[in-house]
Amino acid sequence: MGTRQELVTYLWTDIINTYLRDDALDNIVAHCRRRPADPFGDSGPAIERLLAAGASRSDLRLILRATAYEAVFGTLYAIGDPGVDNDNVLMLHEELLTADPSGLEGRPGSADAL
């Protein structure tokens, strides 16, 4: 990554707006079917239940997009204030799942454990 502008452009196009694609929900469901015990493996069945209950695919994608924005914004804000000692953020993404307070690293049932 290069400049600040390149970073925020990447985050917007490749993280936030990825949920606007028509196949976004199908990709999540398919991944969860292949690997149901993986972190957030329970999100695919949740999407299927919402669709079966009549939720609009477009509305669900908008909710996912807004959630992604809030997550990116909150992360960038936290990195800036309060920050990380010695700006030690390299490879921080590898530690994210270990911070799940349920101890399940985001796997199915982790939301229920809170």
Where are the regions that the model predicts?
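Amphipathic alpha-helical interaction modules
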Residues: 18-68
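Amphipathic protein-protein interaction modules
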Residues: 46-103
